[in-house]
């Protein structure tokens, strides 16, 4: 068996990859122990086996490896994570090793980080609401337990602050079930790592969170393993401990860049923009680990965050992510420049499962109707503002001016809630009604009369201010 053999037949090292000759009984994904000439120990994983040659990806980099004196031992099992319920409240590096100075964890079991394929027949349909405390998500792009809902950001936008806000505020309503957040940060700077750790500690959110941090100067191979380690932890807490787990993964662009780096080192034929041709398949092995299982109490919900290179939504990373996931939350450069936080652009954003997690018994009976009316009114108000820029304010009708007033207040009060305001779904719904009261009742055509009679406040026309863009 290969597990009993030690090889000194390293023939080549290229970037994060090492070639070992004259091997036997070695398997794909097998964990590798590497001992350098100075006694230093490193880990690797078998990427490919051809004949008697094995290609090994190195987790700690290839610096200092002496081809003739390096010893390689194949362990006979894949990379596994030691899991325990005591992981909640702890901080780990990208490979699952504690870095918070806490007590040593006693593992309850060891799990393969690649997980197990979920039989589609065993999946349960996501239909239960998760409250993030952010109106633009909870009310307009509802997040449902078991869903995968990515955030598409851009360079310089505050996606880290949004990720921390969701980690702090996310909760399950009307349930005594345990809720946990698994946070995986990939390729981030020391400053960003400090921000996440301090924010979760200072707000007390660390007590229900598991934090995995892969820094920008850590090896690319580790970056590829980090989200799998985080998802393995989430699956353990969800399906074996009955917890509802929200997994936040940032930044998936850094993950994909690591895939491209390893692919280039393997001299593979590149696909679109140099990314490997299997990028879609690889991303699906992460995103499809979200969900609920019939007969299991817990659930795994994902919010992957990615920065779109050059703000290009047709770039392979957001493009392929959109095919796999169930919607997207898009951050806007324009809203950010105008001082709105979080700068969520609600019109192109979408949660494909929002109808499944809203309504009476889940949120409130007026949820869907007000959501549709707010979308329609905001879109019409944006059109009126654009018309005023071209033709002037005098070209607007009185109704158009009311739509402009609605749009400005919608952005200033509804979207611009700040990163430290936690709104309940009832507060978001009530604020939506308050803003809709700016418009004439005859314009609220997407809401039934009985609902208007019950929820629509009386508009104070003397207080309505009309703002028209004069750019």
Curated annotation (Swiss-Prot):
Transmembrane segments: none
Keyword Chaperone: no
Matching InterPro entries: ATP-synt_VA_C (IPR055190), ATPase_a/bsu_AS (IPR020003), ATPase_F1/V1/A1_a/bsu_N (IPR004100), ATPase_F1/V1/A1_a/bsu_nucl-bd (IPR000194), P-loop_NTPase (IPR027417), V-ATPase_su_B/beta (IPR022879)
A Gene Ontology biological process term: proton motive force-driven plasma membrane ATP synthesis
SUPFAM superfamilies: C-terminal domain of alpha and beta subunits of F1 ATP synthase, P-loop containing nucleoside triphosphate hydrolases
One Pfam family named in its UniProt record: ATP-synt_VA_C
Keywords in alphabetical order: ATP synthesis, Hydrogen ion transport, Ion transport, Transport
Gene Ontology MF terms in the entry: ATP binding; proton-transporting ATP synthase activity, rotational mechanism
CDD domains the UniProt entry points to: ATP-synt_V_A-type_beta_C, ATP-synt_V_A-type_beta_N, V_A-ATPase_B
UniProt family annotation: Belongs to the ATPase alpha/beta chains family.
Function statement: Produces ATP from ADP in the presence of a proton gradient across the membrane. The V-type beta chain is a regulatory subunit.
Name of this protein: V-type ATP synthase beta chain
Taxonomic source organism: Streptococcus pyogenes serotype M1
């Amino acid at each position: 068996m290969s597990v009993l053999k030690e090889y000194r037949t390293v023939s080549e090292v290229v970037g994060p990859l090492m070639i070992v000759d004259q091997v036997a009984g070695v398997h794909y994904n097998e964990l590798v122990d590497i001992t350098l000439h100075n006694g230093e120990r490193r880990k690797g994983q078998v990427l490919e086996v051809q004949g008697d040659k094995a290609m090994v990806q190195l987790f700690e980099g290839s610096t200092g490896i002496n081809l003739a004196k390096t010893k390689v031992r194949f362990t006979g099992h894949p990379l596994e994570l030691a899991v325990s319920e005591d992981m909640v409240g702890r901080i780990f590096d990208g490979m699952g090793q504690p870095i918070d100075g806490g007590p040593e964890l006693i593992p309850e079991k060891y799990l393969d980080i690649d997980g197990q394929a979920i039989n589609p027949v065993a999946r349960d349909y996501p239909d239960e609401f998760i409250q993030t405390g952010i109106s633009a998500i909870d009310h307009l792009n509802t997040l449902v337990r078991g869903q995968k809902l990515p955030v598409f950001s851009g360079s310089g936008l505050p996606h880290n602050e949004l990720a921390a806000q969701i980690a702090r505020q996310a909760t399950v309503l009307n349930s005594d079930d345990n809720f946990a957040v698994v946070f995986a940060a990939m390729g981030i700077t020391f400053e960003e790592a400090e921000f996440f750790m301090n924010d979760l500690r200072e707000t007390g959110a660390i007590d229900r969170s598991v934090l995995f941090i892969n820094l920008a100067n850590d090896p690319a191979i580790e970056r590829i393993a980090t989200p799998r380690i985080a998802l393995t932890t989430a699956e353990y807490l969800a399906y074996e401990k009955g917890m509802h787990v929200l997994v936040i993964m940032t930044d998936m662009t850094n993950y994909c860049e690591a895939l491209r780096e390893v692919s280039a080192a393997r001299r593979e034929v590149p696909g679109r923009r140099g990314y490997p041709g299997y990028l879609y398949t690889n991303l699906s092995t992460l995103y499809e680990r979200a969900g609920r299982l019939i007969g299991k109490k817990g659930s795994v919900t994902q919010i992957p965050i990615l920065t779109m290179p050059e703000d290009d939504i047709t770039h392979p990373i957001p493009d392929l992510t959109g095919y796999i996931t169930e919607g997207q939350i898009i951050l806007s450069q324009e809203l950010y420049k105008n001082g709105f936080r979080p700068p969520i652009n609600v019109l192109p954003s979408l949660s494909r499962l929002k109808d499944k997690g809203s309504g009476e018994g889940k949120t409130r009976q007026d949820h869907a109707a007000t959501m549709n009316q707010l979308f329609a009114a905001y879109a019409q108000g944006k059109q009126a503002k654009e018309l005023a820029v071209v033709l002037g304010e005098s070209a607007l009708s009185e109704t158009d001016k009311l739509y402009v007033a609605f749009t400005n207040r919608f952005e200033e009060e509804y979207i611009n809630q700040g990163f430290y305001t936690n709104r309940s779904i009832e507060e978001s719904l009530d604020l939506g009604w308050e803003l809709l009261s700016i418009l004439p009742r005859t314009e609220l055509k997407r809401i039934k009369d009985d609902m208007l009679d019950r929820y629509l406040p009386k508009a104070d026309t003397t207080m309505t201010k009309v703002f028209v863009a004069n750019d």
